C-alpha cells in the first residue's frame, strides 16, 4: 500500500529528465551490513514508475572497489556510505557536489547536511545518523552516571555482586575521543572560511590532557582493565557481567537478543560540567562523477529515496538507526533508544571528513594505547599525537 501511494504520487507529479526515455539503468552500491534488500525494493518501485531499471549491489571491500572503478570511469552511479570519506573522494574527483533545494534541506537535520559539507559544498544526501552513547543495563544501573567520577564510585558499589561498571574499546579513538572533546579537545580547527584546517590540531589542549588523565585513572583504579577489546565488552554486557558499555545503535540488537533491558544515555563527562561530545556518523548517498545518468540519480534520491515512505521500507529490512529525515524521525521518536541517540548526535560533532583525517585516527589510537598501557603520560602521548598529525 505504501509503495502504491508513492508510485502514484511520483507518476502524477514527477517529470523525469529526458535521459530517462529508453532502457536505462541506475546502479547503486551500499555496504553489506545495511538494508540493501529494502533499498532494492525501493528501486523496483521507482523502476515501475519511471521505466529506469535500478540495480542495488553490496560488494565486498566496497570503498576500495569504488575508488578503483570510478577512477577508471566505471562503477556505480550512486554510492551510499558514511560521510567521513566524502572529502577525500571530492578532492580526488570521484563524486560531484549536490545542490538540494530549500524544501529538501529543511526536511533533513542540519547537522546531517553539515557532515557532508567540504570546501563550502555539499557532497551527499543524508539517510541516517549514528552516534555512540552509554548503553546501560537497567537491572544494574538505575540512573546513568553523569561523570566518570560517578563511574568509579559505581564500580566499587558493584563489587559485592562481582560485576564491573563499564567496559569499552578504549584504545580506539572513535570510542574514547568523546570524553576528550567534551573537555575541550578538537581534531582540526577551522580556517577563515569555516573549513576544517589540517594545520590546526587540538588533540593536546589542556582539557584534552585532563581527560587523558581521567582515562588513565580509570585504569589505575581498576575500573577498567588493560587492553580491553570490543568483543570482550559486548560479550560481558550480554552476559550481565558488565553494567555499561560505550557503543552505537549497531549494538542494540545483540543486547535485545540477550534479553538485556537497556537504556541509552550520553557518555559520562571526564570533567564535571563539560559533557562528552560523541562523533556523529552520517550514512548518505553520493553521486559518482563518471555517471552518465546523474539527473536520474538526483531524481531518485531527492524525490523518492529520501521520502519517509521509502525510508520505512529500508528500515524494515535493516534498522537505519536514527533517520536524518525529520518527519520519519518524529514517527520513531517514541522509541527511547532512538530519541536518546538523536539527542547525543545533536550535541556531538561530525567525524572529520577531510582527506587528512586519517592522520588523526592513526596518531590518536597510538596515543591512547600509550596512555592506557602506561608507556607515556597523557601529556606526552597527546603532544606526540599532535606532532604526528602536523608532520608532512
State each model region's role.
Residues 343-392:
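Conserved C-terminal helix/tail region of periplasmic/extracytoplasmic solute-binding proteins
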Residues 95, 250-253, 283-358, 379:
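Mature extracytoplasmic/periplasmic domains
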Residues 123-127, 132, 152-200, 242:
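Extracytoplasmic/periplasmic solute-binding protein
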Residues 83-132, 143-154, 179, 263-265, ...:
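Hinge/lid segment of periplasmic solute-binding proteins
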Residues 22, 44, 49, 122, ...:
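Extracytoplasmic/periplasmic substrate-recognition and gating elements
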Residues 76-77, 105-138, 165, 274-277, ...:
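A structural signal for short loop-to-beta-strand junctions that line the ligand-binding cleft
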Residues 16-88, 271-273, 380, 384-392:
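Conserved N-terminal structural module of periplasmic/extracytoplasmic solute-binding proteins
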Residues 155, 197-227:
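Glycine-centered hinge/linker elements that transmit conformational signals in sensory
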Amino acid at each position: 500500500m505504501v509503495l502504491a501511494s508513492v508510485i502514484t504520487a511520483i507518476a502524477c507529479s514527477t517529470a523525469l529528465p529526458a535521459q530517462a526515455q529508453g532502457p536505462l539503468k541506475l546502479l547503486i552500491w551500499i555496504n553489506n551490513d545495511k538494508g540493501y534488500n529494502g533499498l532494492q525494493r525501493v528501486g523496483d518501485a521507482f523502476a515501475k514508475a519511471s521505466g529506469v531499471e535500478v540495480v542495488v549491489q553490496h560488494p565486498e571491500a566496497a570503498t576500495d572497489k569504488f575508488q578503483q572503478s570510478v577512477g577508471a570511469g566505471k562503477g556505480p552511479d550512486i554510492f551510499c556510505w558514511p560521510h567521513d570519506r566524502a572529502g577525500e573522494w571530492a578532492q580526488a574527483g570521484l563524486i560531484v557536489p549536490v545542490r538540494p533545494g530549500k524544501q529538501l534541506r529543511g526536511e533533513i537535520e542540519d547537522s546531517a547536511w553539515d557532515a557532508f559539507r567540504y570546501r563550502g559544498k555539499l557532497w551527499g544526501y543524508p539517510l541516517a545518523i549514528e552516534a555512540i552513547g552509554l548503553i546501560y543495563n537497567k537491572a544494574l544501573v538505575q540512573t546513568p552516571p553523569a561523570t566518570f567520577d560517578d563511574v568509579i564510585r559505581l564500580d566499587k558499589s558493584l563489587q559485592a555482586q562481582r560485576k564491573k561498571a563499564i567496559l569499552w574499546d578504549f584504545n580506539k579513538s572513535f570510542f574514547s575521543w568523546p570524553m576528550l572533546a567534551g573537555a575541550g579537545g578538537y581534531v582540526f580547527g577551522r580556517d577563515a572560511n569555516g573549513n576544517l584546517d589540517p594545520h590546526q590540531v587540538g588533540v593536546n589542549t589542556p582539557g584534552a590532557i585532563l581527560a587523558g588523565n581521567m582515562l588513565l585513572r580509570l585504569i589505575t583504579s581498576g575500573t577498567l582493565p588493560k587492553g580491553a577489546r570490543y568483543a570482550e565488552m559486548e560479550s560481558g554486557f550480554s552476559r550481565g557481567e558488565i553494567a555499561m558499555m560505550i557503543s552505537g545503535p549497531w549494538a542494540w540488537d545483540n543486547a535485545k537478543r540477550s534479553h538485556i533491558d537497556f537504556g541509552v544515555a550520553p557518555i559520562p563527562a571526564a570533567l564535571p560540567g563539560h559533557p562528552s561530545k560523541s562523533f556523529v556518523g552520517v550514512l548518505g548517498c553520493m553521486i559518482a562523477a563518471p555517471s552518465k545518468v546523474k539527473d536520474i540519480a538526483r531524481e531518485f534520491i531527492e524525490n523518492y529515496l529520501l521520502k519517509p515512505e521509502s525510508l520505512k521500507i529500508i528500515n524494515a529490512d535493516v534498522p537505519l538507526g536514527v533517520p536524518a529525515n525529520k518527519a520519519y524521525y518524529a514517527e520513531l521518536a517514541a522509541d527511547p533508544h532512538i530519541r536518546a541517540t538523536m539527542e547525543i548526535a545533536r550535541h556531538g560533532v561530525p567525524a572529520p571528513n577531510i582527506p587528512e583525517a586519517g592522520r588523526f585516527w592513526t596518531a590518536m589510537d597510538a596515543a591512547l594505547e600509550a596512555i592506557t598501557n602506561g608507556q607515556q603520560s597523557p601529556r606526552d602521548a597527546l603532544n606526540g599525537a599532535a606532532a604526528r598529525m602536523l608532520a608532512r
